[in-house]
């Protein structure tokens, strides 16, 4: 008996339970319900993980029921569990479980605790649907479900107008992208007469690419459909503003899981992208440009969560870069590693913000390493993995594999930018760490924690080290076999290590040893303008505001007068006037009615005579 649907069922039950009876149970029970439902999903995922590994990457399927059946058009509610789905599920349920445990500490005395766990349970259920669905339409149900959850959790503190506006912005920008995804799905059905992933994969192997020009449009629309969700250029602006929600939300949705949905979808449909090398190159180009823009933007941010948000865009950019050079397994491996060390950094940031009485400006902290030693270690390990610190971190191996694959693919321009941005990553990451934990002690921190706080951080910390590099997703039967020559890899690793260490040292030199260097740099007016330009995200928000928002407001203002309605109202007034005088004829006098009838008959006779003689 297949029990795949239990992975979705228990978080869904948790959501319904917490949404309906939250006023009738103690708050501590809501924590337990929210965590237990995710634990069951994680346990079932582990069960299937063992089964897949024991049975040579066996694939599991389950059809729940027929969704639609109209002539030959048939859509099932079906699940497909292979190595790729399993890898994503371990991130969703495993990292999700640790974040839920941490959230039981973070949200303990905060308002809306039950609502928070209800939303996060619904998110886990929706994300599980997204990665388990065996067809595009069922997948799209989960795709939109995670968008709704993201909107609800970004605007979780809905009493503040800014939070609501940020939630609207995220929702609208991702909807723009989703329109293209829908078009891509409809084109797929038009050409393949199916939404099922495996059927499309089978049919695509028989295509004559030269005569199938629609394939470029299909993959282009799929790409445009995923860049919004994964915060890639040019629809990346929502992610930095999404940090207004609770910090565990940023760890769960906007770092570890939802923003990687685009990477998953391209990987799932890799057989289509392989047939369109031009679009595949565009995937790598978008990833590379996003890496560059987000890395430079992170260098100038002061808000700790915005720094981590830009680093998330950058790391997802590396995944897109890997997909663009057909390094499928490297992209998914880095996705897993990134989910681990970025969850560690976000949860540590949440604990730090709470300890510093909701302060997020890193320059208003300082010298906290003695007050918060465990958080200091967590930031060091998570940051080291983010910057690919050599040999002892998981990020060194996962990101190193991506850059090496790019080098061997011959995309030297992509490789140089990726390598340069790896250097920038080391600078802005340890800038954040040095400013917060070194220097003068500016802020007094509250260091009260418990096991719900410490255990998730410790597990994530351990997996962010070299131990995490032993995680090997079972993808050999998912993607086509590829061979990357390993000659000169040692020299490549030496160069990457030198760049990472140089970035760390430069960060230490500027922000700890010689702060006056920055003052000298900002004496130049051009540098101050450049700093402001990067701080505002390269002007993307300004461009969208000028091009779309103001234009929409202008059209709305013009239409508020409603010219069409004025025309309709004109005819209405004419009818009302005619009706008013017509009613005057109904005065109750018989002589008036007889005279009117005679006059009418004479008028009709005159018309008849006129038309007869003409």
Swiss-Prot record:
Transmembrane as UniProt keyword: yes
UniProt EC number: 7.1.1.-
Q: Which reaction does it catalyse?
A: a quinone + NADH + 5 H(+)(in) = a quinol + NAD(+) + 4 H(+)(out)
Q: Which domain of life is it from?
A: Bacteria
Please give one Gene Ontology molecular function term for this protein: NADH dehydrogenase (ubiquinone) activity
Q: Mind telling me which GO cellular component terms the entry cites?
A: plasma membrane
Q: Where in the cell is it found?
A: Cell membrane
Keyword tags: Cell membrane, Membrane, NAD, Quinone, Translocase, Transmembrane, Transmembrane helix
The entry sums up its family as follows: Belongs to the complex I subunit 5 family.
Subunit record text: Composed of 13 different subunits. Subunits NuoA, H, J, K, L, M, N constitute the membrane sector of the complex.
Name of the featured protein: NADH-quinone oxidoreductase subunit L
Q: Which organism is it from?
A: Buchnera aphidicola subsp. Acyrthosiphon pisum (strain APS) (Acyrthosiphon pisum symbiotic bacterium)
């Amino acid at each position: 008996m297949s029990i795949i649907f239990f992975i979705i069922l228990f978080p869904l039950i948790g959501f319904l339970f917490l949404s309906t009876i939250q006023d009738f149970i103690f708050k501590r029970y809501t924590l337990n319900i929210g965590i237990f439902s995710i634990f069951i999903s994680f346990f079932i995922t582990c069960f299937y993980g063992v089964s897949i590994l024991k049975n040579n990457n066996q694939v599991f399927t389950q059809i729940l029921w027929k969704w639609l059946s109209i002539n030959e058009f048939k859509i099932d509610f079906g699940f497909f569990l292979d190595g790729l789905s399993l890898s994503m599920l371990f991130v969703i349920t495993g990292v999700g479980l640790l974040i839920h445990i941490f959230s039981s500490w973070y949200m303990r005395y905060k308002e809306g605790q039950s609502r928070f766990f209800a939303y996060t349970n619904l998110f886990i259920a929706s994300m599980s649907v997204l990665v388990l669905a065996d067809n595009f339409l069922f997948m799209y149900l989960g795709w939109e479900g995670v968008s709704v959850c993201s909107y609800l959790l970004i605007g979780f503190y809905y009493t503040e107008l800014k939070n609501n506006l940020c939630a609207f912005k995220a929702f609208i920008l991702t909807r723009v992208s989703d329109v293209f995804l829908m078009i891509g799905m409809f084109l797929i059905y038009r050409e393949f007469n199916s939404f099922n992933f495996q059927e499309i994969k089978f049919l695509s192997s028989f295509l004559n690419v030269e005569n199938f020009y629609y394939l470029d449009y299909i993959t282009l629309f799929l790409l445009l459909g995923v860049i919004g969700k994964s915060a890639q250029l040019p629809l990346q602006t929502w992610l930095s503003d999404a940090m207004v929600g609770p910090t565990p939300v940023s760890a769960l949705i906007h770092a570890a899981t939802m923003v990687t949905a685009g990477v998953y979808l391209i990987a799932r449909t890799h057989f289509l992208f392989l047939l369109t090398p031009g679009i595949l190159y565009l995937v790598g180009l978008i990833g590379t440009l996003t890496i560059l823009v987000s890395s430079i933007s992170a260098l100038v941010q002061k808000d700790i969560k915005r720094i981590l948000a830009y680093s998330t865009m950058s790391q997802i950019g590396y995944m897109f870069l890997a997909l663009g050079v057909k390094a499928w397994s490297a992209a998914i491996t880095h996705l897993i590693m990134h989910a681990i060390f970025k969850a560690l950094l976000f949860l540590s940031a949440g604990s730090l913000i709470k300890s510093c009485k909701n302060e997020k400006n890193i320059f208003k902290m300082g010298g906290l390493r003695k007050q918060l030693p465990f958080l200091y270690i967590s930031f060091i390990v998570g940051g080291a993995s983010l910057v690919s610190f050599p040999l002892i971190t998981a990020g060194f191996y996962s990101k190193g594999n991506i850059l090496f694959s790019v080098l061997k693919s011959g995309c030297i321009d992509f490789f140089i930018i990726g390598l340069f941005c790896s250097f920038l990553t080391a600078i802005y990451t340890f800038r954040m760490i040095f400013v917060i934990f070194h220097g003068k002690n500016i802020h007094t921190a509250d260091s009260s924690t418990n096991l719900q706080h410490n255990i998730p951080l410790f597990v994530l910390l351990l997996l962010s080290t070299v131990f995490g590099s032993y995680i090997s997703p079972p993808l050999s039967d998912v993607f086509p076999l590829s061979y990357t020559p390993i000659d000169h890899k040692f020299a490549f690793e030496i160069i990457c290590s030198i760049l990472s260490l140089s970035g760390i040292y430069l960060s230490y030199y500027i922000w700890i040893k010689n702060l006056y260097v920055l003052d000298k740099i900002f004496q130049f007016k051009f540098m101050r303008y450049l700093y402001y330009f990067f701080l505002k995200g390269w002007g993307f928000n300004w461009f969208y505001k000028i091009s779309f928002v103001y234009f929409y407001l202008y059209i709305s203002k013009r239409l508020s007068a409603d010219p069409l309605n004025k025309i309709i109202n004109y005819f209405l007034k004419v009818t009302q006037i005619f009706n008013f005088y017509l009613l005057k004829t109904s005065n109750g006098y018989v002589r008036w009615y007889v005279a009117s009838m005679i006059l009418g008959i004479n008028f009709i006779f005159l018309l008849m005579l006129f038309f007869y003689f003409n």
